[in-house]
Amino acid sequence: MKILKWILGIIGTFALFLVVTFYAETPKYEYKSVPLYSNFDSYYREKLQISRSKKVRHGNEEKLVRYSADKTDFSILYIHGFGASRAEGEEVTDQLAKDFKANLYYVRLPGHGTNLENHRDTTFEEILQDSETAFLECEKLGKKTILIGTSMGGLISTYLAAKYPEKVHALVLVSPFYDFTNPFSVIYQFSWGKDFANIVMGKIRKSTEEEKRNPASAFWYRDQYLAAVQNLSDLREFILGTDPFSKISSPTLLFYYYKNEKNQDVSASVSSMLNAFKKVNENGKASPLNKAVKVEFGNHVLFSKYMKSDKDLILKETETFIQNVFSLNKNLSHN
């Protein structure tokens, strides 16, 4: 009997330890209002100067594509994912901007395109602050705004659409990251999780030699500090804690890669994407134009020239969605 009490006592103490350390450091964020620029080009030049000072790799810096010096009927803001860059979405998004003659801006998230240590040390608050400021600045580019985000960028776009429903006129979510596919990743929600992960798996997740030879390596972090995943986990925990899906009213288009149980997105949970989309559709304010598109030929990254995917399907669905949202009837040709 004493042994049983002793065992139960240990189990109880361990359970209490898990509960306390799980909630010990709940991520917090509040947008710090900053003076906005009088024109977008001034903001853009300042961001490029910052990128130059940080020695951002070529092709990873911010990019502005203008079809008018004035506001276009709508503009597009693209937000890339964790460890990625604008190359993640350029092939499809550039074509969309060209087809609709829409001003387009690709943000460079803090800690990206620079070096592994900068990526590791950039907090989720910095990433969200920069994204929110870019979003507010982009109102100068178009009369209305289309927000496109891939993976972590989809998570951030979800947050912005929930916080600013009147400012997001169309939301395109590409493999949005709402949860990890590896159940071990829950470890990052504990205060000791990052240190434990470093002990078990080492400090850096190394890429293969084949991955390093791939031209895409110039635009993604192939090697990554596991500590950087803590920032992604914190971002996810904070955003999902705001209950964003109950607040989204913008027309929403979701793309996800799924062919079967064996062939599906291995970086972000497909079931979490579909569950989130279901919550949006059931929140009482959802747009009738909402649509989820299953892409059977693809992978986690769907909009990039460096990754194979059904671009014809993706372009057709996105263009139709935009035409429906803005009541357009354009005959589009991809020349």
What is each stretch, according to the model?
Residues 2-42:
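N-terminal membrane-anchoring alpha-helices
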Residues 32-61, 176-244, 295, 302-311:
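The alpha/beta-hydrolase serine catalytic core
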Residues 56-100, 104-108:
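Short, surface-exposed "cap/lid" segments of acyl-processing enzymes
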Residues 115-141:
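Catalytic nucleophile-loop/oxyanion-hole region of alpha/beta-hydrolase
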